[in-house]
Amino acid sequence: MSSVEKKPEGVNTGAGDRHNLKTEWPELVGKSVEEAKKVILQDKPEAQIIVLPVGTIVTMEYRIDRVRLFVDKLDNIAQVPRVG
C-alpha cells in the first residue's frame, strides 16, 4: 500500500511554492468576477487581484502576490486564474 498522497487539483507543490499554497483555480472558469475574488482571497488573502479583458497583453514577470482574472464580455472568468 502506497503512502504517497495525490496532489489536489489546482495546487502547485513544485519549485517556488514554498508554503504549498494553491496557485491556480480551474473551478472558477465561467464564474463571476465577484465570486472568483471571494474564493481566491479565501485561499490566498494577500493576493492582488487584477481584472482584465480576455486577450489583453500583459507583462511576463512572475509575482507570487498577483492573480490575474481574464474576463469575457459578460464579466465571467474566461481563463484559469493563476498566480503570477
Curated annotation (Swiss-Prot):
Belongs to the protease inhibitor I13 (potato type I serine protease inhibitor) family. One of its GO terms (biological process) is response to wounding. The keyword Transferase does not apply. Residues 1-23 are annotated as: Disordered. It comes from Hordeum vulgare. Keywords: Protease inhibitor, Serine protease inhibitor. The record marks 60-61 as: Reactive bond. Inhibits both subtilisin and chymotrypsin. It holds the Pfam family potato_inhibit. This is Subtilisin-chymotrypsin inhibitor-2A. The keyword Zinc does not apply. InterPro entries: Prot_inh_pot1, Prot_inh_pot1_sf. One of its GO terms (molecular function) is serine-type endopeptidase inhibitor activity.
